[in-house]
Amino acid sequence: MLDLSNFFLTRPLANRFREVVSGSKDGAPKWAYQMLEGNDEGYFGPESAVWEVHGCVSTIIGGIRALLLQAAHPAALAGVAEHSRYESDPLGRLAGTTKWLTITSFGATEVIEKEARRVNEMHSKVIGNYQAKDGQAHNYAAQDPEYLMWVHCAFTDAFLQTYIQLGYKFKTDRKSTRLNSSHIPLSRMPSSA
């Protein structure tokens, strides 16, 4: 893989990108200090496929793929269209998703559970209805396990496939299987931010 980290244009672009994604001028938002809390490796740990894949730059491209796949579900699309700040504050929305993904991937269990409570509280208000292709009206709620599973599977598939398609290799042959089987019980799963 080509290393562009020392290319003269890379540093300012990287700095700006960190600011955009994190929501902080220095690329280190206040919430990042939560990552120092807790005394365990969270749900996954440093040897997991989650740490390997989510710690890779391919996650940025995978995130775009995930958003497109998530939007293919009419309930997810309606929820975002009616309740998200993606139009009025797209960078803030991106920073919120970055916070959620970082904490749930790399944080200690108590930090993940705190983030889950925050996001689940926010998403408890995300309810509404949408019209399906057949003209039928359907209700949705962001905390519905079916929709949560759709969103989480879209993230998993998008991050994993992008990682593989960009030519990254797992340190062991069994990691892709572990990524697919790594899960958080739905009762404790934080909604996607």
Residue ranges and their predicted role:
Residues 1-178, 182, 193:
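Mature, function-bearing regions of proteins
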